[in-house]
Each structure stands twice: as C-alpha cells, then as structure tokens.
Amino acid sequence: ETDAIVHLAGKAQDTKNESEAAEYFAVNTGLTQKIFDYFLETSAQKFIFFSSVKAAAESVPGEYLTEDAAPAPKGPYGESKIKAEEYLLSKLSQAEKLQKKVYIVRPCMIHGPGNKGNLNLLYQVVSKGIPWPLGAFDNRRSFCSIDNIAFAVEQLIVRDDIPSGIYQVCDDEALSTNELIGLITESSGKKTLIWK
C-alpha cells in the first residue's frame, strides 16, 4: 500500500538549448498527467509534484518570488512545467473529493553533492582559480540545499495539517554570485578572485 507519490521525473532544462520543445511537453506535462491520473486511482493520499520556480518566472523583480505571483514562464521548460501544474490544479477538486492532497513544489536551484548544471560550472571555474569577471553586478539568487528540500518533502508526507497547494521552497537567505563565489573559494581553500 502506498501513502504518497513523489513525482520527480522530468526533462531538465537544457543549458545547451539542443532539446526540442515537444520533448519538454511530452515528459514534463504528459508524463505528469499520466502519473497523476494513476494516483487518483490508487490508495495513496498525497501527490507531490516537483515543478520548478521556472514555472512561475524566469527572473525575480524583487528579492523573493511568492506563490501569489502570476506565472510568467519563458521557454519550453518553464512552460511545460506550468502546463503540468495547471492540469493538477484542474483536477484538485476531484482529488479532494477522494480525501487526497496535491502539493506542487517549486524549488529554486538545488545545491548539494553531485550537483549539475550552472552551479557546477561556476564551481569548476572558481576552483580552477579563474577570476570572476562580473563582480560589479549585485545580483541575488535563492538556492535550496538538498537537505532543506528533503525536509520539506518529509513534512508534506508526515504531516496532515498542510493544505494542498503550491509551495516555493528555498533556503532562508538569497545570495549574490559574489557571496556564492566567496563560499566556494572558502570551502575549497582557494583565494577569491573577483573583478569589480
């Protein structure tokens, strides 16, 4: 017997822009619809879908993006994730009639062991001692540690007082790229080289 379904499968954002848009929609939207429809037929009481902050926005005008912000995804990755969310929300009343809960988790960039993507590229640049040429920009970005995302999912599973809905998950504080580089160099014993 299954208590919860945690849906993590999906097509990740392609940093090389080699993927066809249809691939994102087939996997991120179509597969989600199939898994959710299966969930409605099972004894599982909770469905946790890993969407992405990219379903809500490509960039954040203020310091934080809230769940109340009107979604404005850009590109097939974010657009396919928001379409999956819309499908789940369109079936929410059906799930609730069955006493089931539906959680849409929108994590920002997750960091931890084995990280891939842009954060790993930044780590490689910094750990090689290459100076960061964009130090004059004061950008801030939210991250989420793998430990924090695991804790959030655990709470969604074990607690019954959390209502169905959309939850954007991140660490407590946003970091600038310069602060992030400082943390990387400190942890790797390298000297921080930032051009301003």
Residue ranges and their predicted role:
Residues 1-29, 34, 38-41, 55:
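NAD(P)H-binding glycine-rich loop region in Rossmannoid oxidoreductase-like domains
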Residues 26, 30, 60-111, 115, ...:
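Catalytic helix-loop patch of NAD(P)-dependent Rossmann-fold dehydrogenases
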Residues 115-121, 135-158, 164-165:
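Substrate-positioning beta->alpha
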Residues 159-196:
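Mid/C-terminal beta-alpha module of Rossmann-like enzyme folds, strongest
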